[in-house]
Amino acid sequence: MTLFILTETSAGYALLKAKDKKLLKRDDLATEASTAEGVSNLLKLKSFQKFDSATAALEEVASVVEGKVTPRLASLLDEIKDEKKVSLAVADPKLGNAIGKLPGLDISLIADSTTADIYRAIREHLPTLIPGLLPQDMSTMSLGLSHSLARHKLKFSPDKIDTMIVQAIGLLDDLDKELNNYAMRVKEWYGWHFPELAKILNDNIAYSRLVLKMGMRSNFENADLAEILPEEIEAAVKAAADRSMGTEISEDDLENIQALAEQVVGFSEYRSQLAGYITARMNAIAPNLTALVGDLVGARLIAHAGSLTNLSKSPASTLQILGAEKALFRALKTKHDTPKYGLIYHASLIGQATGKNKGKMARVLAAKASLGLRVDALAEWDDDVTEEDKAALGTEARFNLERKLAALEGKPLKPRGVAIGPDGASAQPGKFNINEARKYNPDADAVDQDKATPSKKMLVQEVQDEEMADADSDEEPAANGVDSDSSDEETSKKSKKSKGSEIEKLAEKAGLSVKRYKRKLERGEIQFDAAGNPSAISKKDIKKAKKEAKKEAKKASKGDDKEKKRKRSDETEDTDGKKKKKKRDD
């Protein structure tokens, strides 16, 4: 049986024919094939199919690795169809199974460990078996093909490098901390010279720019600050500079302060540039996630998970509480309620929701974000696909979530395409404004005075039913035309006033307000002496009285129990006596 050996190389497919039919069964195969002359004596080239380009080589080798037979390989195997009693040695068993399924190819396949020695010898001495193939060219082609194959396996793309996002968002957080520290140091340092400026101007960047431009506070009076400050704040700054209480500083001190202020301005400019870079990278790597939660929140989620692939493998429940691991494990340990959200809490959709709906929105948003993440991580797009098409899933999901949030909050539904701000209202990007710092208003101070609280009208009043007088009655109206009922009302009002004045006097004697006196009087906590002067019973006395009442109640209950026991014992004695009499009579 003729033996053929199929060899896949970086240059093409080679079909080798063994000169010895029992080559694989020889015991001295390894020693004889250790040299180039020995290999050339054992094998000869039957046919060679060369790859046309590097792209074709990548496609062919990738198909062979997956165990598929390409048209080029099938045409090479057609050359041994006509031969009878043919055996073919293949290095990959998966590829051997695929070749065995080809129609019209009646050959016996060998894809076991017996071919290991011969394939090792072929790889070592391949240039001697294929004429015109130099060792230098072979190594170059093998290196290029291995890189292309590895890139193909990893589906490598420069736009899919999520490491850049992880590093960038970490740098952004570090910049925020350093920028805040530097800005506070500038305010404290320059505050010795112009302390009023920090109270008027809140913005750190504008403060640093002002220090860089003006220097000494004496330069503020005739300077034009319209490029940095609005008119109102500019006037306030100039007025404060004229009557400032700060100390004088030297030019050397001012140079160092301005050097630090320059660092603050430079850091702020680089931070805005870095934020734009993160936005662009997030739109390229995870457009659906960016459409749902925003670029900064999405970047922090990717950085926390380690990579976009790891984040896409996480379920929605994990995505919802990502970043709150300490709180989660603490809640599980103490058997308390688990947290509802982690890093996703900072998304604008959750920020628009009120307290009762934040948990619902976090759960729904995490579910939609997990779907969008899988599309971002695993979808393969063509070159002609636009960015809008890539982010279509996230945009549609965000629109539906905004409508659901509006329905939960009871707000009117916004039409498609309307930007919704954190307060839930349609918003447009506004201009940057520097607001003046809030000041204490001394004119609003006032001395509290005792004001008589107006008596509240009773919502329900009692009305007494009175009998109507007959028409033929002899009663005549009063001379002034006023009925006798009016006089009764006047007398009742006078009596009420007199009662109210008496209660006020008694409350003053007891040292209580009228309200407290009435409450204590209703509870029975007011006692009167022999002269009729009231006094409030202290809480200690009330507690003692309650304890004594409880003790008396317990004693009474114990006495009742004793009487009941005595009655029972008397009854039992009577019944026993009756039984004894009956026995005597009998």
Swiss-Prot record:
Main location: nucleus
Residues covered by the Nop domain: 285-410
GO biological process: box C/D sno(s)RNA 3'-end processing; endonucleolytic cleavage in 5'-ETS of tricistronic rRNA transcript (SSU-rRNA, 5.8S rRNA, LSU-rRNA); endonucleolytic cleavage in ITS1 to separate SSU-rRNA from 5.8S rRNA and LSU-rRNA from tricistronic rRNA transcript (SSU-rRNA, 5.8S rRNA, LSU-rRNA); endonucleolytic cleavage to generate mature 5'-end of SSU-rRNA from (SSU-rRNA, 5.8S rRNA, LSU-rRNA); protein localization to nucleolus; snoRNA guided rRNA 2'-O-methylation
Annotated keywords: Nucleus, Ribonucleoprotein, Ribosome biogenesis, rRNA processing
Compositional bias (Acidic residues): 464-477
Record-level Gene Ontology MF annotations: snoRNA binding; snRNA binding
Comp. bias (Basic and acidic residues): 499-508, 549-563
Subcellular location: Nucleus, Nucleolus
Domain of life: Eukaryota
Record-level GO cellular component terms: box C/D methylation guide snoRNP complex; nucleolus; small-subunit processome
Chain residue ranges for the region called Disordered: 464-586
Family: Belongs to the NOP5/NOP56 family.
Purpose: Required for pre-18S rRNA processing. May bind microtubules.
UniProt-recorded name of the protein: Nucleolar protein 58
Annotated gene: nop58
